[in-house]
Design a protein with these regions (language model features):
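Inter-helical turn/loop segments and adjacent helix faces that build the functional surface
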Residues: 202-214
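Glycine-rich active-site loop/lid subdomains used to bind and stabilize high-energy intermediates
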Residues: 174, 211, 223
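AMP-forming adenylation/ATP pyrophosphatase catalytic core
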Residues: 2-33, 45, 53, 57-59, ...
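Alpha-helix N-cap and coil->helix boundary residues
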Residues: 67, 210, 272-275
Length: 312
C-alpha cells in the first residue's frame, strides 16, 4: 500500500472515534514522523469537521531552538495547519532525554486542558515501539513496561504504531516536505539512539529481518496479558480493601503486586519500583517480623494483626 494512503488510513481510523467540532492537538517536533502525522491528520480531519492545532514544543536546550520551532511552524502553515509554539524549561534531573520528555508531556497536558482538547495525537511508529520494548528488556522490566506504548492512553493517541518510520519518510517525500533532523537523534550518548543505530541493526543482521515487527507483536501480546491482570487486580481491590494477609496470600503474585500498587496509589505512593513493591510483598510472603516499609510520599506500610496497614 502507498505510504501516504496507509498513514491516512491509520489516522482516519482514530479520528472516526471523535465527533465533529472536537479539537485534536498534534504534537509536532518537525521530524518525519510528526510532520507526516500533522499533514495526514489535517487532510482526514477536515472531512470529519474536526479541528486540529499543532503544538510545537521548544525545549530551549539546543542552540537555535527558537528558530527551529519557527521553521517548523512555517512548514505547518504552508499546509494551512494552525500551530502554536510552547516554550518549556527543562530541569535536568535524570538525564537530558528523560527530563525533556517530562517537560514536554507536562506542557502537552496543560495546554490540552486549557484548550479543552479531546485528544493529543503523537507520531510514534512501530520502530519507536520496538526500541521501547528493547530498552524495557535491558532494564529487566515487567509485562506492563514491556508492552510498550498504547495506541490510546488518556488524552494521547498514537495512530502510527503499526506503521514504520520508512513510511513516514516516504510520505513526507510524497508531500514535498523536508523534515528537520534533530541532532540528538544521532547522538550515541543517548541510550535510545544506541538501541536504534547499533543494537537493532545487529539483531536484524544476526537474527534475520523482521526483528522490529517481532518485538511489536510481543509487546501487544504482553499488553493483552497485562490488561487482563490489571482487570483482575482492580476487581479484587474494588471488592476487598481490607488488605488482610490471609486474602492476599491466596492471590497469584502477579495480581497481588498489582493490588498493592492500587492500595499504595490511593495513599499517594505512585510509580513505585519493583524493589519497593518487593519490600511490601515481603511483609506478606516472607514475614520474619520485619519493621515497616517506608515509601515515597511519606507512605509507610506495616503488618499488624494479620493485615497490612498503610499510613502517612
Amino acid at each position: 500500500m502507498d505510504a501516504l494512503v496507509s498513514l491516512r488510513s491509520a489516522v482516519r481510523a482514530e479520528l472516526e472515534k471523535f465527533s465533529a467540532g472536537d479539537l485534536i492537538l498534534l504534537g509536532v517536533s518537525g521530524g518525519a514522523d510528526s510532520l507526516a502525522l500533522a499533514f495526514t491528520t489535517q487532510i482526514e480531519a477536515k472531512k470529519l469537521a474536526i479541528r486540529t492545532i499543532a503544538i510545537v514544543v521548544d525545549h530551549q536546550i539546543q542552540t537555535g531552538s527558537a528558530d527551529i520551532a519557527k521553521k517548523v511552524c512555517e512548514i505547518l502553515n504552508s499546509g494551512k495547519i494552525e500551530s502554536q509554539i510552547v516554550k518549556v524549561k527543562v530541569e535536568v534531573t535524570d538525564g537530558v532525554e528523560a527530563s525533556a520528555r517530562r517537560a514536554r508531556y507536562e506542557a502537552f497536558e496543560k495546554i490540552a486542558k486549557d484548550m479543552n482538547a479531546s485528544a493529543l495525537f503523537l507520531g510514534h511508529t512501530k520502530d519507536d515501539q520496538a526500541e521501547t520494548v528493547l530498552l524495557g528488556l535491558a532494564r529487566g522490566s515487567g509485562a506492563r513496561s514491556l508492552s510498550g506504548m498504547a495506541t490510546r492512553n488518556g488524552i494521547y493517541v498514537r495512530p502510527f504504531l503499526r506503521n514504520s518510520r520508512a513510511e513516514t519518510l516516504k510520505a513526507c517525500k510524497e508531500l514535498g516536505l523536508e523534515p528537520w533532523n534533530d541532532p540528538h537523534n544521532e547522538d550515541l550518548s543517548f541510550l535510545r539512539v544506541r538501541a536504534r543505530k547499533k543494537v537493532l541493526p545487529i539483531m536484524e543482521s544476526e537474527l534475520g529481518p523482521g526483528i522490529a515487527d517481532a518485538l511489536v507483536r510481543s509487546a501487544q501480546l504482553l499488553r493483552d496479558d497485562a490488561d487482563t491482570l490489571d482487570y483482575l487486580a482492580n476487581q479484587f481491590w474494588s471488592e476487598d480493601k481490607s488488605l488482610e494477609i490471609a486474602a492476599l496470600e491466596k492471590l497469584p503474585k502477579a495480581i497481588r503486586s498489582r493490588v498493592l500498587r492500587l492500595a499504595l496509589a490511593e495513599k499517594g505512593a505512585l510509580q513505585l519500583s519493583a524493589e519497593q513493591i518487593g519490600q511490601v510483598e515481603a511483609l506478606i510472603s516472607n514475614w520474619k517480623g520485619q519493621g515497616e516499609v517506608s515509601l515515597p510520599a511519606g507512605v509507610k506500610v506495616s503488618r499488624i494483626s494479620g493485615r497490612l496497614t498503610l499510613s502517612k
